[in-house]
Structures are given as structure tokens and as C-alpha cells.
């Protein structure tokens, strides 16, 4: 009999992500015309892709079957020049989730803690939990970060303090 391996407990305890409802589903539920709904959830642009972006993407269509430069050499060098910092001080990722998860992989484990605010971006908690690290949730002030209490929550095992700005879901 083949046994399927089970994930670590810290991963099994993560609740599945619940994305926002598609416009079509919401329209059916509420008997609305889908064109009357503007979806502002799920970090989606209700205006769609700009013509300038569409033109630039179309120029690169022949390259989509190839892996991109994983090091981001050109982008890092352009950002380096613009920001006046070394390319070695830049980390690129596929959105904030990717970068936050990379930080958790690099700095967290079961013997370490991370600090984040109540009502923080959900990935801060998920990245901490996925590493079996101890999460220290600091109560918010008017849905914002209480920086003094976050500072006071630092322990000898704290390796990451997540301060999201702007913060999803509060916008602070």
C-alpha cells in the first residue's frame, strides 16, 4: 500500500486562503448586472490593463516560453542607479508574498519569533506559521501599527518584525 506523506503540523494548521468572489458569482447571488459591480478586493485593478502595458507585453510574447532572468540583472541595475544603492542590497520577487515568504525561510524556524500587528497582512502570519515559528501579535491602534508596543514585544529570539505599509486589509 502506498502511503501519502503528510505535511508538517505547522503547515497542516494553516487555513486555506479564501479569495474574493468572482464578479459573475456575486452578480448571480445578488441578482445584479455584472457590469454594475466594481471589484476592489483581491488586489485586482478594476480598470484592466493600460494600453501602454499591453503594447509592451505584446512585444515580448515570443519570449514567454523561455525562463526569464531569475536574478533580475537589468531591473536590479536600473533600480540600483535610481536609488543609489548596490544591486546586492535588492531582492526581487513575484509580489510581496514571495518576498515575505523568502524572509521567513531565511530567518524563522521553531526556535524563533516574528512580530506583527493585529489586522496585519495575512501573509505575515502565514509565513510565520509555515516555518513553525512563534508569532507575536501586537494589538493595533485604530487599525494601525502600535510601533512602541511592537518594539516592547521584541524578544531575544525575535528575527523579523513585519510592518506592512500600506497594510492590507486596513489601508494604513
Model features per residue range: what roles?
Residues 43-45, 96-97, 121, 165-169:
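Short glycine-rich anion-binding loops that position phosphate/pyrophosphate groups of nucleotides
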Residues 2-97, 102:
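N-terminal small-domain helix-loop-helix segment of the aminotransferase-like
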Residues 130-135:
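A short helix-loop-beta submotif of the ANL/AMP-binding
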Residues 106-127, 138:
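Conserved PLP-anchoring active-site segment centered on the Schiff-base-forming lysine
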Amino acid at each position: 500500500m502506498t502511503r501519502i506523506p503528510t505535511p508538517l503540523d505547522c503547515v497542516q494548521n494553516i487555513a486555506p486562503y479564501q479569495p474574493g468572489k468572482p464578479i459573475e458569482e456575486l452578480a448571480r447571488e445578488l441578482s445584479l448586472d455584472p457590469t454594475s459591480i466594481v471589484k476592489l478586493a483581491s488586489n485586482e485593478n478594476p480598470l484592466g490593463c493600460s494600453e501602454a502595458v499591453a503594447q509592451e507585453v505584446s512585444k515580448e510574447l515570443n519570449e514567454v516560453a523561455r525562463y526569464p532572468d531569475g536574478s533580475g540583472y537589468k531591473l536590479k541595475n536600473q533600480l540600483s542607479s535610481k536609488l543609489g544603492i548596490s544591486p546586492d542590497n535588492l531582492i526581487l520577487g513575484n509580489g510581496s508574498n514571495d518576498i515575505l515568504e523568502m524572509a521567513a525561510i531565511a530567518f524563522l524556524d521553531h526556535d524563533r519569533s516574528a512580530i506583527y500587528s493585529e489586522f496585519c497582512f495575512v501573509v505575515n502570519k502565514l509565513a510565520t506559521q509555515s516555518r513553525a515559528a512563534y508569532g507575536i501579535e501586537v494589538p493595533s491602534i485604530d487599525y494601525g501599527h502600535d510601533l512602541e508596543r511592537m518594539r516592547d514585544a521584541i524578544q531575544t529570539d525575535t528575527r523579523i518584525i513585519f510592518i506592512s505599509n500600506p497594510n492590507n486589509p486596513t489601508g494604513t
